[in-house]
Each structure stands twice: as structure tokens, then as C-alpha cells.
């Protein structure tokens, strides 16, 4: 493998054996591609905004004299960039401008004569834009739109599995689900009649729909039944014989023909009998007259002479009727062929219960069911039925729905109209009847072929269309009003409904979620999440077990491990690593093609439905060098089952062992040794890890760390290769390689880094460069590390030296004992940034004012504020300190004489304002790192706001001029090269000032052209700089667009440094979580023979019952990795020659049986080897991919190489006594995470505080400053102990005895420790509730 200069800094040793056929795809593509489809212009008009416009336009007036046509649209440039939007609290969006054409036709002239055409561009609101990382900035906060897994449109056949009716009879149903429009359900009832429901309303006999489609009874019977024809010849009854229909029946008479008896009366008719009848070509047999009684006629029979109806279609024949028919000359009688086995009489029975007999009565019946209580008219009934399923405005199956519909009915073509046809409805009924007759299977709703993904783009398009439809109604009205000659398109369109619909979706839809930004992994996982909840999806309460369960089709599409615990389990899932959606929105996963038993590198993506037709081998099947399967029998999956197949039956093979799991689960090493429940917790808890002060790469990883860190967008990644020309904490400049430059550009890339900003979860986002001056970089190299990344690898926690042993009960029940060294070295110190805002409003009594002049506040409290009343940057503040001084006007009250006097002496200001300053919340302390002041347009800016503005302008100017200098330098170096190659002497050139270079002329025409081109560029560059500076200046100095009634907003940012402490929650990656019970002095910790103490002591009893053995293997492998690092460290300290170092590192990389990774250190220079060794000092990072990891033997070999005992256990000594523990202890390195459940955020105590209004009991919870509930069971405990006085105190003065508690307070102040309990308020509430029921209850005074 070829490594770039940056990648050579630290190479992770990979234990993976299976070759990597397919690289991990870009992990955010599901979001970015979907949104791209939404906003990019689609000439076909199938997706996105274009599709929405085409579906609504052209809009015609009611008279048809004019119409508004859609031409095209364009998205403008956003006003602010992403960072500015976040600071200002606005939405990152672009204006949508649509070109519309108003066409007016001549009234008197023949149709289609155009009188006037006007075209105009109309503003249609703002469309939020997606950032490069797949998020949206809505009102200043980053949000993610989660993809939804919903039932695909189409037709589904299902059954109630015998649960509806008490007899346990299975009732089948069919449901046609459109993309938008009414649902159509067909269902059987226990009596086997077929019914229909529209939109889950009252059920009607199914034939009503057919009658409404203008079918007569005869035609209905004709559609669903085969005929049995009887003929009357010579007073004998003959039946046309189709032998196959007799199979399985019992003969009720002798079946004979031509004097030969084929079946005797009372015998069963078998296949042999049928073969004989077919062989002798018997077409008719004679039947006794009684045989026809009870048969059902298939059409109307009329007496030709009188025109009288003898018997109507679907009537049962009797012998009398037969005689009448014979008399009136009908010698041929057609009846319906039915039997109890596979030709049930369901439709015939349904026609009998159908109260309607013609189209009109059917339409009226449907109208009554849809609009109960409204008087039906013929027109209303017809238009309602037309609009239900046959109008393109109201009903759309969509391309997906039509494809699924046609596939389900086994039709050949998969495209068609979006509305239903007569044939569609009849085919669905036919298939449902076939299923009831035992032919065909019902569908599995949980199959991923029947559920599809709706991503951002599609949901945004739907919302946009909703807005457009609202506009359409208004436009129709306007078009019909007249005086069109003066109107322009923009007078027709009101953009409000559109922007309201879009805003509502992005701001408050259930699937638009506040982004989980704890760390890079939680960001990526959130964007790859798939939810079955949300509009048009399931609800938690109604979702049963089946929907939540893992389905065989999840394989490689949805992760079986990562899902929340709790009420949402199984409803919210995560996309697997390699999964993607196809054009229809179904999930598909890649497989390697197998041709004639040889596995090729050809990759095919298969959806769940396609996969069902193939035999697919597992990724861990053994192959030889040519790609043949080694074993004769290979474990494969086929049709959702796993079994053995011979190798020539295999069609496909998995691409990777980690294809089954999601990104989160693929980061757990030795996942294959963990129980699924714990793996689930491990995958979920990695998302809660707080980024530590110094990120530390995991010693034992899975090889996915780099992909996650790069794709999450928290790191700065090189867009093009080049050399590092300049680097400091906030900017990296790359001089681009010649071959990657665009013609005529300066060839400089500038990367501005994010410094100390706040994330959604109040953690700190900060980027630090990890390249040095002069280093070569290639495209895709990581230039700067973000939060939780280390040299471009995800680093959520720290490598800790752990020992598995009990220690004085401090690790009882998953508690964790931590060494003081961890605190001293700041291993788990995290920085949290809080934003506190102070809003100054315009009130009825006058404006609120931000000032340092606050009534009744001492000098000390104002010491940290400047003269504008805003805290200084760098001030250290604690709970209760004033950050921003603010006073609010107070209502005039009746003044006492004393106050009047004070007023008279000291003037007005004395008492008409109250202090409403922004203070630091209780329990929070930190350092002020930034202050932002936003002032409404037209409000005078205070001194502090002007200072901040001045500073921002200076900074912007400095940044831009530095950028300009860098770009100029790049440009002039190219100009110099052209001049020198054109014959100008270098020395003379360097003496000339640079501005004069461009005035020189060259004889060589081509060089002169190049020079002129560069000169043009130079002018453009300066012009661009001026434009940028002006835009920046305008943005900084202009007033802010604040909410109505708001004059000023001051935002203060506090940085809080949190060390690890008892009560914080920690976890490993295997679901092994615990709470810190004690921080132990280093000298008391167990230590080994070299005197190295352990950092963390874990309880060994946490392993066996939880079955997450992965943590033990990780510990051993971590020990080996550290051992190798220690040896390299020793060699570096002894300054051994590079050759020895190179040889040892090479041995470490080569270790392991047939691993895929080949690191060849002979291609590294000595400097590169030394730098690699420097980065391996703290341990050699190791990758052990999921399901393809290091084997036990390989771990032992690695331990041996590091001169460590192969058992992984060492002798430890007690730190307090120095005595040896009685048996060796497992010690190693485990990657531990500090989770975002910190004791500082949770600890809370109350003395007195707020009370509930009704019950007068203290509130609960930290947010309300509430108390701890003394509940039912606690009361029982006190009762059981007979602690009567304590109990009385708990139920009265400490809770809701209002008078008692105020008296108690007074008593304590007076030093009199007595209580006088009275009546608890909640008892009064009970009395009131009983009285409200009309029962008078009174308490007697004794």
C-alpha cells in the first residue's frame, strides 16, 4: 500500500485478513445526495423543486380565458455564510426566484388565440440550504432532518392471522396505498363476503365499487367466475364437461358416456379418472335434473315472447325455474362454476348482500359513507367518486407505487399512470380472491422490499408542494377576477404560504431534530439515522413487536445492533456502513459477483427484493488466490434463511465483514465476542462521549476511525495536494501542486480553522493544525484535528491502564476506582461552553435598558462589568454574578409619604425601575470567553457594541489583507517565472518594484499573452479583495434583524473546565458502564514489579454475566500494543541506529497470519522512520476489524514481541501495604470514555423554593429547583418503623401545610425549634374534589 507523507506519521497495524474490495463510501451521502436532488434543476422534472412546480403549474382560471405558466426557477446567493448565521441566530437559506408567464386568451376568438403574454421573475420565499456536512442552520442552531422508513406505496395483501374473529378464521385483506390520496382496502368478513373500505371508513360490499365503475351484475360475474354450461336435449340434461374441474369431488351420480361408466356413484374422482376422460375426449355427460338445483345462473334470462324476466343473473336455480326456462325456449343455461376448495362463491355472495343495483345508487351509497349527513346529488356523487381515485390532483401512486403495484400483480411493464384504472381495481380483487382460494401468498410488511426510505429532499419537496397548492387556490381566484390587462405575475403570487410550509417543516417537524453534536461520531450517526416514526409513519404506542424486530432483509442495509433502548427500540435504526438507497428509495447493499464458482471484484448493489432470488455467500468464506471457494459446501443466505450450498450454486458474496453493522457498531473492536445487548449499549454510549482536552487515539481500534473523523467534517481536509506554506493556530496555507492547479489561478488554498466555538451539546469545538511548515500534503490528507480526533483518527476517550480486581468495595456494582494521576494529567478534563443571552425589550411602560447603573446592588457585584453594563472578556464568574446589567421600568404604584419625600429629594429615577439583570445560573462557574452584542436597526449602539464592531472590522481587514498578500505572493512568483523564462535577467527584475513588473513587454508572443493573463488576474484579485472587504464591513456595521419588540440582545459565552470527579459516568466500548466511586491517591493504587501503578480498577464480576468478553481481549491487545510502544521508546532513548529501529517496527507490522496489510518500511526514509517511531512511543495503534479481528494466538504473539507474559496477567502489589496480591491479575490498556452524564449537571439541593399552585407541594426536578419526592413507599417505611413524628413532619410542614411551614420558618429564626402542624393543602384539594362530585363533606371541630 502507498502511504502519503501525512499518513506515514502513524500507521495503524491491521489484523484484517479479508481483502478490501470496496472502500467505505462517503458516510454522509444519503443526506447530501438527497438534498442535491431537491435543489438542482432536473430537466426531466421527476425530482425536487422542478417536479413540484410542474405538478401544480400551469394554473388556469375557472373560465379558461387565462393561465399562469411556470418557466424556470433559480436559487440566489445566501446573505450570510454558515458561521454568521449561527452567531446571528438566523436561518442559512437562499432566496427562490421563479420565472412565470401569464398568458391571456382572446374571449371571442376561437380557442387558443393568444391575446397577451407577460413574463416575470417572482420571489417565492427562502429555501434553507444544507451545509457541506449535511446539516441545516435554522434560527442559528444546527439541525438534522432524519430519514424516514415508511410503508412503500403500492398494493399489499395481508391477513389478520385469525385474531379478529372468535372462531380463529383467517380473514384476508388487500390495501392499495397511494403516495398521496385515499387508501382503498378490500377485506373478507367471517361469512366470506368481500367488502371495501375507503380511508378506513365504514365498510361497503366490494361490488359497490364495481357498480360505481359502471359494471352490471352480469359483467361482474363474468369477470370473476368460469361458466358451467347445461343443455337440454331430448328432455335430458347434458353438461359440458371440463374433466379437470371434477378433481377431488365425490360423484353424486354415475359418470358415464357412450355406454361406458367412468366413475361410479359415491366414489371420489381421482387424477386417474380425469386422465381417462381426457384420453377418450369426452365433451358432454348426462346429469340428473336434481344436479342443477342450487346452481347459480350467470346472466339474465328473459321470455322472448312476453319480455318478462324469468330469472336474473346470480339467482339460484330450482326445478320450477328450470321448467320455465325450458318452456320459454332457453335450451342452453350458463351457471357459475364454484366449489368449496379453490373456486369460492365469494363475489356471487357479495352481490346478494349488495343493496345497490345500478351505477347511481352505488355512487350515492359511496357518497353517504364518505359524507354522512349531506344530501347527495348526482353531480356531487359523481365528482366525489371521480376525485377519489381517478383525478391526478387528488391521487398519485407515484413511480414507486406504480412499480410496486405492477410487480405485485405480476405484470410485465413497471411504469404506468399515477391514478388507478378499472383493471387495477379488478386485478387486486382477483388476486385477493386467489389468495383466499389458496393460490398465492400474503406479503410480509416488515420486509425491506415493502418499506422505503424518504430522505430530506423528498420530504422538503412534499412540504413545498403543499405550500404551492395553497397558493394555487389564491391564484385561481385572482385569475378569475377580471382586469388581467394591468396585472403582472407577481401580483398573483403570495409567497407567505410557501415559506410558511417550508419553515414549519424545517423548524418543527418531528423529523427535523436538534443535531446531536457531542462528538464527531454522534453527528455522523444522527445523519445516518432512519426513523419509522414521524408524519405518515408509525407511532410508538401502536408499533408491535414485529415492526421493531430484526428482519432477515436488514442484512447489510440496517444495523441489527444500534437502536435506542426504551420505548423507541427497533423504531429508530441506523444505516449499515455500505448501504445506500436506489432510485425508488429502497435500501440496497453491495455484493461481489460470483461467476462459475469464481468470486470476481465486480460489485452489484442489490435491493431486498432482488436479493431474494440469489444465493449469497458470507464475507468470511475462504477463497484461494484465484478466487475459488476452498470448501465444497459454503455457508450462504437464500430467501432469508442461512444454510449450506455447494460452491457452484453461489451467485454473490458479501463485500466486507462489517457490511452488516452501522458506523457506531463498526468502531467496537472484538464486537464478535460481545453479547448483542451489551454491543447495543456500547454503540449507543460512544455517541455520548465528551471530547477530552487532549484527544488520544485508541490503541485498539477497528480501522474505521479515520473514515469517521474525515467524513464527519470536524477535521480540515486538503482539497488539493501541495506544500504547507504557512501554518498557525487559526489558518493553514497550502501552495498547490502545479498539476492540480486550474489554468490562470494563484494556486493557493487557504483553510481557516474553527476556534473554541460552542456545540449544540455545550461541548467545545476547536481545530488544531497537525501539519508543519514545508510538509508535502496530498488531496484528502488531514490538515487539522477537530474535537475528538487525533492525527485524523476518531479519538473519543483515553487509553487507560486497567486492572480487573476487587478493591475494598469501591468497585461494587459497576463502580469504578480511578487513580489521582488521571486527574493530575488532565486525561478526562473537558471544556464546556455555555451561551447565556440577555434580551432587552420594548415594554408597555418603556424600553428596558442595558446599563451598569442598577438599583440596590453593591459596588462588588458590578466590579466585573464595564461602563455599558456588560461583563469583561476573561472575567472569572461564579453562580449569582451579574453578567449583563439590565433594568426594566416598573408600573407606577401608590407611593407612601416617605417615598414621595425621597422622590422629591433625589429626583425621578429612584424607584421606577427594577433590576432584571442576566446572572450566572446557580452551580455554574467559568470564564467569559466572548461577548456578542446585537442591536436593532435604528437603535443607538452602546460603547461596548461599537468596540466589538471595531474589533471585528480590524480582524476582518487583517484576515483579508493577509489572504491577499498570500495570493499576491503566489501570483508574483508565477509572473517572475514567466518574465525570467521570457529573457528578463533575474537580478534586474528583483531590483524593480513588483508593481512595475507587469509593465514590462516580452518579445515572445506566447509569454506576453501569459503575462497579460496574469496581469488581468492581479487586477481581478484586488477588485475581489475590495468587494469582499466592503461586503464584510456592511455586514458588521448594519443593524441586526431582531424579533419584534426586541431592542438588543447580548450573548455571553462562558467556558467551564470540568475535571473528572466521583459521580461522573464512564464507559468502555463494550457496554461496560459505571460511575466513579472514588479518586484514589496514586500511592494507594495497585502497582506492578516496575512500580507502575494502574489508572483504573474495574470489577471482574462485571464481565461473566454480561458476556461482553470483547473488553478482556481489548485489554490484552492494548497491553501488547503498549509493550511494543515501550520497546520502541526504550530504543529511541538509547539512540539506537535507525536500521535496528526499522527492523523491529517492520517485525511488529508483519506479525499475524496472512494479514491483508503490507507495510514496507524500506520505502520510508530514515527521517520518516524516526517520525513514525516517535508517534509509536506511547503504543502501536492496532486495528482489529469487526468479525475479522485478531485471533487469540496473534494476541499472544504480539505480547511475546513486547516482552510481556502471554497470559496477559501480571503480579500486582497493594499500594497501601506493599504486599503482593495472592494471584496474578489481568492488567492491560482499555479505551475508556467519559460520558455526557456529569455529576455537575445533575447534583442539586433545595432548602426552600417554589411550590405547585394547586397542591402547594414543592416542585420536582433540577430545572424547577425542586425537592426530592417522599413517595408512597417511603411513607410505608416510616409507618413500619413507627416513626410517627418524623412522618407527621414529612406530610405537613415539610410538604404542603402552608401556615405550618411559614410558622416553622419564623420559629427557627427565633431560635424556637418547635413545629405546629396544621391541615395539609392536598387534603383540602381532596375535599374540594369530592364536593365537585356533589358529595358534601365537612370536617367537625371537636
From Swiss-Prot:
<keyword id="KW-0808">Transferase</keyword>
<comment type="function">
    <text>DNA-dependent RNA polymerase catalyzes the transcription of DNA into RNA using the four ribonucleoside triphosphates as substrates.</text>
</comment>
<dbReference type="InterPro" id="IPR014724">
    <property type="entry name" value="RNA_pol_RPB2_OB-fold"/>
</dbReference>
<dbReference type="InterPro" id="IPR007645">
    <property type="entry name" value="RNA_pol_Rpb2_3"/>
</dbReference>
<keyword id="KW-0804">Transcription</keyword>
<dbReference type="InterPro" id="IPR042107">
    <property type="entry name" value="DNA-dir_RNA_pol_bsu_ext_1_sf"/>
</dbReference>
<dbReference type="GO" id="GO:0006351">
    <property type="term" value="P:DNA-templated transcription"/>
</dbReference>
<dbReference type="InterPro" id="IPR007120">
    <property type="entry name" value="DNA-dir_RNAP_su2_dom"/>
</dbReference>
<dbReference type="InterPro" id="IPR007642">
    <property type="entry name" value="RNA_pol_Rpb2_2"/>
</dbReference>
<dbReference type="GO" id="GO:0000428">
    <property type="term" value="C:DNA-directed RNA polymerase complex"/>
</dbReference>
<dbReference type="GO" id="GO:0003677">
    <property type="term" value="F:DNA binding"/>
</dbReference>
<dbReference type="InterPro" id="IPR007121">
    <property type="entry name" value="RNA_pol_bsu_CS"/>
</dbReference>
<dbReference type="Pfam" id="PF04565">
    <property type="entry name" value="RNA_pol_Rpb2_3"/>
</dbReference>
<comment type="subunit">
    <text>The RNAP catalytic core consists of 2 alpha, 1 beta, 1 beta' and 1 omega subunit. When a sigma factor is associated with the core the holoenzyme is formed, which can initiate transcription.</text>
</comment>
<dbReference type="Pfam" id="PF10385">
    <property type="entry name" value="RNA_pol_Rpb2_45"/>
</dbReference>
<dbReference type="InterPro" id="IPR015712">
    <property type="entry name" value="DNA-dir_RNA_pol_su2"/>
</dbReference>
<comment type="similarity">
    <text>Belongs to the RNA polymerase beta chain family.</text>
</comment>
<dbReference type="Pfam" id="PF00562">
    <property type="entry name" value="RNA_pol_Rpb2_6"/>
</dbReference>
<dbReference type="InterPro" id="IPR007644">
    <property type="entry name" value="RNA_pol_bsu_protrusion"/>
</dbReference>
<dbReference type="Pfam" id="PF04563">
    <property type="entry name" value="RNA_pol_Rpb2_1"/>
</dbReference>
<dbReference type="InterPro" id="IPR037034">
    <property type="entry name" value="RNA_pol_Rpb2_2_sf"/>
</dbReference>
<dbReference type="Pfam" id="PF04561">
    <property type="entry name" value="RNA_pol_Rpb2_2"/>
</dbReference>
<dbReference type="InterPro" id="IPR010243">
    <property type="entry name" value="RNA_pol_bsu_bac"/>
</dbReference>
<dbReference type="InterPro" id="IPR037033">
    <property type="entry name" value="DNA-dir_RNAP_su2_hyb_sf"/>
</dbReference>
<dbReference type="InterPro" id="IPR007641">
    <property type="entry name" value="RNA_pol_Rpb2_7"/>
</dbReference>
<dbReference type="Pfam" id="PF04560">
    <property type="entry name" value="RNA_pol_Rpb2_7"/>
</dbReference>
<protein>
    <recommendedName>
        <fullName>DNA-directed RNA polymerase subunit beta</fullName>
        <ecNumber>2.7.7.6</ecNumber>
    </recommendedName>
</protein>
<dbReference type="GO" id="GO:0003899">
    <property type="term" value="F:DNA-directed RNA polymerase activity"/>
</dbReference>
<keyword id="KW-0548">Nucleotidyltransferase</keyword>
<dbReference type="GO" id="GO:0032549">
    <property type="term" value="F:ribonucleoside binding"/>
</dbReference>
<dbReference type="InterPro" id="IPR019462">
    <property type="entry name" value="DNA-dir_RNA_pol_bsu_external_1"/>
</dbReference>
<keyword id="KW-0240">DNA-directed RNA polymerase</keyword>
Amino acid at each position: 500500500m502507498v502511504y502519503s507523507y501525512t499518513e506515514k506519521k502513524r500507521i495503524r497495524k491491521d489484523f484484517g485478513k479479508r481483502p478490501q474490495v470496496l472502500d467505505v463510501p462517503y458516510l454522509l451521502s444519503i443526506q447530501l445526495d438527497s438534498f442535491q436532488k431537491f435543489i438542482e434543476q432536473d430537466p426531466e422534472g421527476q425530482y425536487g423543486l422542478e417536479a413540484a412546480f410542474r405538478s401544480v403549474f400551469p394554473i388556469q382560471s375557472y373560465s379558461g380565458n387565462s393561465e399562469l405558466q411556470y418557466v424556470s426557477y433559480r436559487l440566489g446567493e445566501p446573505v450570510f455564510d454558515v458561521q454568521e448565521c449561527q452567531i446571528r441566530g438566523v436561518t442559512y437559506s437562499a432566496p427562490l426566484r421563479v420565472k412565470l408567464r401569464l398568458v391571456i386568451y382572446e374571449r371571442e376568438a376561437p380557442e387558443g388565440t393568444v391575446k397577451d403574454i407577460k413574463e416575470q421573475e417572482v420571489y417565492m420565499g427562502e429555501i434553507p440550504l444544507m451545509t457541506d456536512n449535511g446539516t441545516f442552520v435554522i434560527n442559528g442552531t444546527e439541525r438534522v432532518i432524519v430519514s424516514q422508513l415508511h410503508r412503500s406505496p403500492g398494493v399489499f395483501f395481508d391477513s389478520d392471522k385469525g385474531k379478529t374473529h372468535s372462531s380463529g378464521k383467517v380473514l384476508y385483506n388487500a390495501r392499495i396505498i397511494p403516495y398521496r390520496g385515499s387508501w382503498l382496502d378490500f377485506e373478507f368478513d367471517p361469512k366470506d363476503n368481500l367488502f371495501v373500505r375507503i380511508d378506513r371508513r365504514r365498510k361497503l360490499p366490494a361490488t359497490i365499487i364495481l357498480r360505481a365503475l359502471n359494471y352490471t351484475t352480469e359483467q361482474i360475474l363474468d369477470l370473476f367466475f368460469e361458466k358451467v354450461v347445461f343443455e337440454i336435449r331430448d328432455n335430458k340434461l347434458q353438461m359440458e364437461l371440463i374433466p379437470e374441474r371434477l378433481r377431488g369431488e365425490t360423484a353424486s351420480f354415475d359418470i358415464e358416456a357412450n355406454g361406458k361408466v367412468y366413475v361410479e356413484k359415491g366414489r371420489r374422482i381421482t387424477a386417474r379418472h380425469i386422465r381417462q376422460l381426457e384420453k377418450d375426449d369426452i365433451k358432454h355427460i348426462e346429469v340428473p335434473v336434481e344436479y342443477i338445483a342450487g346452481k347459480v345462473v350467470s346472466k339474465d334470462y328473459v321470455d322472448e315472447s312476453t319480455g318478462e324476466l324469468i330469472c336474473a343473473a346470480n339467482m339460484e336455480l330450482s326445478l320450477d325455474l328450470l321448467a320455465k326456462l325450458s318452456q320459454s325456449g332457453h335450451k342452453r343455461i350458463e351457471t357459475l362454476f364454484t366449489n368449496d376448495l379453490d373456486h369460492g362463491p365469494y363475489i356471487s355472495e357479495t352481490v346478494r348482500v349488495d343493496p345497490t343495483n345500478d351505477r347511481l345508487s352505488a355512487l350515492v351509497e359511496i357518497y353517504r359513507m364518505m359524507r354522512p349527513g349531506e344530501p347527495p346529488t348526482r353531480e356531487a356523487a359523481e365528482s366525489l367518486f371521480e376525485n377519489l381515485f381517478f383525478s391526478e390532483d387528488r391521487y398519485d401512486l407515484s413511480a414507486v407505487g406504480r412499480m410496486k403495484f405492477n410487480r405485485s400483480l405480476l405484470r410485465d411493464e413497471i411504469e404506468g399512470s399515477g391514478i388507478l384504472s378499472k383493471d387495477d381495481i379488478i386485478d387486486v380483487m382477483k388476486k385477493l380472491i386467489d389468495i383466499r382460494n389458496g393460490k398465492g401468498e400474503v406479503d410480509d410488511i416488515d420486509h425491506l422490499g415493502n418499506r422505503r426510505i424518504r430522505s430530506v429532499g423528498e420530504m422538503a419537496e412534499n412540504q413545498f408542494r403543499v405550500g404551492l397548492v395553497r397558493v394555487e387556490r389564491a391564484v385561481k381566484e385572482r385569475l378569475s377576477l377580471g382586469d388581467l390587462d394591468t396585472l403582472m405575475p407577481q401580483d398573483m403570487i403570495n409567497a407567505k404560504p410557501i415559506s410558511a410550509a417550508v419553515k414549519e417543516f424545517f423548524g418543527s417537524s418531528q423529523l427535523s431534530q436538534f443535531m446531536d453534536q457531542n462528538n464527531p461520531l454522534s453527528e455522523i450517526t444522527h445523519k445516518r439515522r432512519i426513523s419509522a416514526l414521524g408524519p405518515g409513519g408509525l407511532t410508538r404506542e401502536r408499533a408491535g413487536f414485529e415492526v421493531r424486530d430484526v428482519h432477515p432483509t436488514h442484512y447489510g442495509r440496517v444495523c441489527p445492533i444500534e437502536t435506542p433502548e426504551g420505548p423507541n427500540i427497533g423504531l429508530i435504526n441506523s444505516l449499515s456502513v455500505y448501504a445506500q438507497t436506489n432510485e425508488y428509495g429502497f435500501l440496497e447493499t453491495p455484493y461481489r459477483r460470483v461467476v462459475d464458482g469464481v468470486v470476481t471484484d465486480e460489485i452489484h448493489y442489490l435491493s431486498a427484493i432482488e436479493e431474494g432470488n440469489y444465493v449469497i455467500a458470507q464475507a468470511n468464506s475462504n477463497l484461494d488466490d484465484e478466487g475459488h471457494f476452498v470448501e465444497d459446501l459454503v455457508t450462504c443466505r437464500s430467501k432469508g434463511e442461512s444454510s449450506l450450498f455447494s460452491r457452484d450454486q453461489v451467485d454473490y458474496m458479501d463485500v466486507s465483514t462489517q457490511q452488516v453493522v452501522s458506523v457506531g457498531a463498526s468502531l467496537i473492536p472484538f464486537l464478535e465476542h460481545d453479547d448483542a445487548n451489551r454491543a447495543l449499549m456500547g454503540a449507543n454510549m460512544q455517541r455520548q462521549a465528551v471530547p477530552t482536552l487532549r484527544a488520544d487515539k485508541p490503541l485498539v481500534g477497528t480501522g474505521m476511525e479515520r473514515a469517521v473523523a474525515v467524513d464527519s467534517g470536524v477535521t480540515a481536509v486538503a482539497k488539493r495536494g501541495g506544500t504547507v506554506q504557512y501554518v498557525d493556530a487559526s489558518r493553514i496555507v497550502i501552495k498547490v501542486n502545479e498539476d492540480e492547479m486550474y489554468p490562470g489561478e494563484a494556486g493557493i488554498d487557504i483553510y481557516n480553522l474553527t476556534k473554541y466555538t460552542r456545540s449544540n451539546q455545550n461541548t467545545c469545538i476547536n481545530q488544531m493544525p497537525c501539519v508543519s511548515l514545508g510538509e508535502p500534503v496530498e488531496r484528502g490528507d488531514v490538515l487539522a484535528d477537530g474535537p475528538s480526533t487525533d492525527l485524523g483518527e476518531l479519538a473519543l476517550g483515553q487509553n487507560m491502564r486497567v486492572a480487573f480486581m476487587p478493591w475494598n468495595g469501591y468497585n461494587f456494582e459497576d463502580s469504578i476506582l480511578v487513580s489521582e494521576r488521571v486527574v493530575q494529567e488532565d486525561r478526562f478534563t473537558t471544556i464546556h461552553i455555555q451561551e447565556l443571552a440577555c434580551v432587552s425589550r420594548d415594554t408597555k411602560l418603556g424600553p428596558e435598558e442595558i446599563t451598569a447603573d442598577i438599583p440596590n446592588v453593591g459596588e462588588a457585584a458590578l466590579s466585573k462589568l464595564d461602563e455599558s453594563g456588560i461583563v469583561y472578556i476573561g472575567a472569572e464568574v461564579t453562580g449569582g454574578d451579574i453578567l449583563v446589567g439590565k433594568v426594566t421600568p416598573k408600573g407606577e404604584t401608590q407611593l407612601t409619604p416617605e417615598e414621595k419625600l425621597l422622590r422629591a429629594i433625589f429626583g425621578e429615577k429612584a424607584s421606577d425601575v427594577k433590576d432584571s439583570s442576566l446572572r450566572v445560573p446557580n452551580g455554574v462557574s467559568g470564564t467569559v470567553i466572548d461577548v456578542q452584542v446585537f442591536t436593532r436597526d435604528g437603535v443607538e449602539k452602546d460603547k461596548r457594541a461599537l468596540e466589538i464592531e471595531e474589533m471585528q472590522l480590524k480582524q476582518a481587514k487583517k484576515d483579508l489583507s493577509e489572504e491577499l498578500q498570500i495570493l499576491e505572493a503566489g501570483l508574483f512568483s508565477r509572473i517572475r517565472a514567466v518574465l525570467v523564462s521570457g529573457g528578463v535577467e533575474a537580478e534586474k527584475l528583483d531590483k524593480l518594484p513588483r508593481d512595475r513588473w507587469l509593465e514590462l513587454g516580452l518579445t515572445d508572443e506566447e509569454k506576453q499573452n501569459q503575462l497579460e493573463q496574469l496581469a488581468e488576474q492581479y487586477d481581478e484579485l484586488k477588485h475581489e479583495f475590495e468587494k469582499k472587504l466592503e461586503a464584510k464591513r456592511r455586514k458588521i456595521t448594519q443593524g441586526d434583524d431582531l424579533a419584534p419588540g426586541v431592542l438588543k440582545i447580548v450573548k455571553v459565552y462562558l467556558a467551564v473546565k470540568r475535571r473528572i470527579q466521583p459521580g461522573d459516568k464512564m464507559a468502555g466500548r463494550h457496554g461496560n458502564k459505571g460511575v466513579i466511586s472514588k479518586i484514589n491517591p496514586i500511592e494507594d493504587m495497585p502497582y506492578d514489579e516496575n512500580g507502575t501503578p494502574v489508572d483504573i480498577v474495574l470489577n471482574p464480576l462485571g464481565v461473566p454475566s454480561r458476556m461482553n468478553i470483547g473488553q478482556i481481549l481489548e485489554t490484552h491487545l492494548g497491553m501488547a500494543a503498549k509493550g511494543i510502544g515501550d520497546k520502541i521508546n526504550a530504543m529511541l532513548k538509547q539512540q539506537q541506529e535507525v536500521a535496528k529501529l526499522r527492523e523491529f517496527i517492520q517485525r511488529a507490522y508483519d506479525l499475524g497470519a496472512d494479514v491483508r496489510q503490507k507495510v514496507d518500511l524500506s520505502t520510508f526514509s530514515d527521517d520518516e522512520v524516526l517520525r513514525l517511531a516517535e508517534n509509536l512511543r506511547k503504543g502501536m495503534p492496532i486495528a482489529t476489524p469487526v468479525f475479522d479481528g485478531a485471533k487469540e494466538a496473534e494476541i499472544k504473539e504480539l505480547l511475546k514481541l513486547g516482552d510481556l507474559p502471554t497470559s496477559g496477567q501480571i503480579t500486582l502489589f497493594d499500594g497501601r501495604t506493599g504486599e503482593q496480591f495472592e494471584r496474578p491479575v489481568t492488567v492491560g490498556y482499555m479505551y475508556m470514555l467519559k460520558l455526557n452524564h456529569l455529576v455537575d449537571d445533575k447534583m442539586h439541593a433545595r432548602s426552600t423554593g417554589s411550590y405547585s399552585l394547586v397542591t402547594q407541594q414543592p416542585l420536582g426536578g433540577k430545572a424547577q429547583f425542586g425537592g426530592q419526592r417522599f413517595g408512597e413507599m417511603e411513607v410505608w417505611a416510616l409507618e413500619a418503623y413507627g416513626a410517627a413524628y418524623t412522618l407527621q413532619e414529612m406530610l405537613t410542614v415539610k410538604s404542603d401545610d402552608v401556615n405550618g411551614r411559614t410558622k416553622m420558618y419564623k420559629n427557627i429564626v427565633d431560635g424556637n425549634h418547635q413545629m405546629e402542624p396544621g391541615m395539609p393543602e392536598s387534603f383540602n384539594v381532596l375535599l374540594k374534589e369530592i364536593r365537585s362530585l356533589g358529595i358534601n363533606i365537612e370536617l367537625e371541630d371537636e
